[in-house]
Amino acid sequence: PFTFAFEQVGTNCGLIGKNAAVEVDGTVYWMSENGFFRYGGQLESLPCLVEDFVFDDLNTVTKQHVNAGLNNLFGEINWFYVSSGSNTVNRVVTYNYFDSSIQRPIWTTGTLNRTAWTDSAVFGKPHATEYDTSTNGTVGSATYVQGNSDGVSIYYEHEKGLNQVKEGAESAIAANIESGDFDISITKEGGASTKGDGEFMMKISRVIPDFLSQTGDATITLNLRDFPTDVEASSALGPFTVTTSTKKIDTRARARAISLKVSNTSTSQFWKLGTFRLDIQPDGRR
C-alpha cells in the first residue's frame, strides 16, 4: 500500500499564485482566482467584504506576483498583489484571523509594495522586501549595483519605530482607517422600528475621540453624503486635528450617510484606535 497519497478536497479554489498561501496553527489560508479560502480539516470559503474591490482591480497577467505574508504579532494575513494599473506589487488586502468571526469577518485594504515576507518567528520582527523601480542601486554618491537600470529590492524590518527609514532618510508612514457609511433608524413609541437606509437626515454635533494610545497628532475626517452617487466630502469644519489632550470635537456635520476616517501624515505619529463616540440625532430636511 502507498504510505503517502494526494487527495483532492476542493475544486475551483486553487492558488492564484505559487506564493499565495500561508499556514497558521495548522490551518492553511490562501488566495484563489475565485476568492479567499482556508483548510483546517475541511475546506471553507472566507466571507470577504472587500472581495469585489480586490478582484475587480487585480492585474490578472501578474497573478504569480501575489504573495502571502503572516504577521502573527497582530493576527494578520496579508496578500500583496498587483493592481490593474501597475506592473509591480503595489497593494495589500489583510485578513485578521484573531478577531474575525463568521458574523463579523475583519478585512482591510491598503497600498503597500512587498514582494517577499517572513514573520516574526524567524527574526523577532516581520521582515520584508520592496521592489523599487525608481532606484538603480545608487544611494547618495555611492553606486552599489553597477550598470543596473531595472530597479532594486529594499529590505525592511517591520513593527519597529514610528517612521519609515529608507536610504538613511526618515519619512512618515502615512496611515488611515475609514468606516463604511452609516445612517440612523428611528423607533416610534408604541410602534415598529423604522429602518434608516438613508431615509433620514442626521446631525452629528460632536465627536469624542478615544485612542488606546497616541503619539503626536491624528486627523479625524467626517465624510458626508446625501445620495449614493454623491462624491464624499468632508464636513465644513473638518478635517479635525486631535492631540493627546483633545477631549471633544464640535463638528456641526449633517448628511444622510456619514463615514469616519482617522489618519496621520507626519513623522513620529502613532495611534491605536479605541471606541469613538458620536453625538447623533435626527435632523429635518431642507
Where are these regions (language model features)?
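Beta-sheet repeat architectures centered on beta-propellers
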Residues: C13-N19, E23-T27, E33-R286
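Surface-exposed extracellular loop regions of Gram-negative outer-membrane beta-barrel proteins
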Residues: P1-G10
